[in-house]
């Protein structure tokens, strides 16, 4: 099950004992998923949802909290609609429900944001409003570079109200308009986990955190692998360049090089991928890595001096550009 569907399914089973919180959740759910229609002179309340469990929860809450009957209609997938959608519709008592849930104000005018009893309510109601908004039009992307918890809002007023509710919970959320659609977004991974926990998606937050940790471990492993590859490439280039310089040094000096320097140079050529420490251990008698490095350095310096005196290419000339590409 996708992350968003899993969260909505879990939230549809959250037990909310406080009446004020149940009203706040329903107000947000109807505001973010619903609409008001005039049918034959009557106000009809509708909410379109993409999860059957959420639709059943809304229908049950409308009956238990307000005592109004409602209908559920199923819209089969097709066209631009992915998957079935569920319409919860209140016809007979639509206007009463709209007034009681804050979709209409006392003068019968549509409320654009969230109703006052939610906006100015306690923190518990702010949490419930977020739960309702997410069940209505929320989405949760996989943990990663662009992970986000997002609510699609019916307008800028409801987006600002939801940002304010998040602030009361202690969560940083931002509203933005994308292609003419208002959205509220939580981007920080820790904030997403905290908000999921607050609204009651405990199993989902564990799954989300597990995927988040797994992705971070994988990213760290990839960075280390890239780092190791880069080090190997640098080491390979250095080994090729060192071998070319030593070969040129032995050509320049021929039999005039001191034996201990020549031996160090030949050891380098015989074991091109060995580290200085390994090279020193292979010497007879064994040498420290500083000692073997010093001998090779003196061999190259001696050869370069001879080359300058003779006016011929030195050891650096033996390192061609193609040797540095590995």
UniProtKB/Swiss-Prot annotation:
Example GO biological process: regulation of sporulation
DNA-binding region, residue intervals: 275-308
Entry annotated with the keyword Transmembrane helix: no
Coiled-coil stretches noted in the UniProt entry, renumbered to this chain: none
Keyword hit for Cell division: yes
InterPro entries associated with the record: Homing_endonucl, Sporu_reg_WhiA_N_dom, Sporulation_regulator_WhiA, Sporulation_regulator_WhiA_C, WhiA_LAGLIDADG_dom
Pfam family membership, one: WhiA_N
UniProt keyword terms in alphabetical order: Cell cycle, Cell division, DNA-binding
GO terms for MF: DNA binding
Highest taxon above the source species: Bacteria
Role, per record: Involved in cell division and chromosome segregation.
Family: Belongs to the WhiA family.
Protein name: Probable cell division protein WhiA
Organism name: Salinispora tropica (strain ATCC BAA-916 / DSM 44818 / JCM 13857 / NBRC 105044 / CNB-440)
Gene name of the record: whiA
């Amino acid at each position: 099950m996708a992350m968003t569907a899993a969260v909505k399914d879990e939230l549809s089973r959250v037990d909310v004992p406080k009446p004020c919180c149940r009203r706040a959740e329903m107000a947000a759910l109807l505001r973010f998923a619903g609409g008001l229609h005039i049918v034959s002179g009557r106000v009809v309340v509708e909410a379109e949802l993409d999860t059957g469990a959420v639709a059943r929860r809304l229908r049950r809450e409308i009956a238990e909290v307000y005592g109004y009957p409602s209908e559920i209609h199923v819209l089969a997938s097709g066209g631009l609609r992915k998957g079935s959608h569920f319409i919860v519709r209140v016809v007979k008592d639509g206007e009463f429900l709209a007034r009681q849930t804050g979709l209409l104000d006392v003068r019968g005018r549509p409320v654009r944001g969230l109703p006052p009893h939610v906006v100015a309510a306690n923190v518990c109601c702010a949490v419930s409003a977020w739960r309702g908004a997410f069940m209505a039009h929320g989405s949760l992307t996989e943990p990663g570079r662009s992970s986000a918890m997002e609510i699609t809002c019916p307008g800028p007023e409801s987006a600002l109200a939801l940002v304010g509710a998040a602030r009361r919970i202690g969560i940083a959320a931002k509203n933005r308009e994308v292609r003419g659609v208002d959205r509220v977004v939580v981007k920080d991974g820790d904030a997403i986990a905290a908000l999921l926990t607050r609204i009651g998606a405990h199993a989902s937050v564990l799954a989300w955190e597990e995927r988040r940790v797994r992705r971070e471990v994988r990213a760290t492993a990839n960075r280390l692998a890239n780092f190791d590859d880069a080090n190997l490439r640098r080491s390979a280039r250095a080994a090729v360049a060192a071998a070319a310089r030593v070969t040129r040094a032995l050509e320049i000096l021929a039999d005039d090089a001191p034996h201990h320097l020549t031996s160090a140079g030949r050891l380098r050529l015989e074991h091109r991928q060995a580290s200085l420490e390994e090279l020193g251990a292979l010497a007879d008698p064994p040498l420290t890595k500083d000692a073997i490095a010093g001998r090779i350095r003196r061999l190259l310096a001696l050869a370069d001096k001879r080359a300058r005196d003779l006016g011929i290419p030195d050891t650096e000339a033996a390192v061609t550009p193609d040797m540095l590409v590995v």
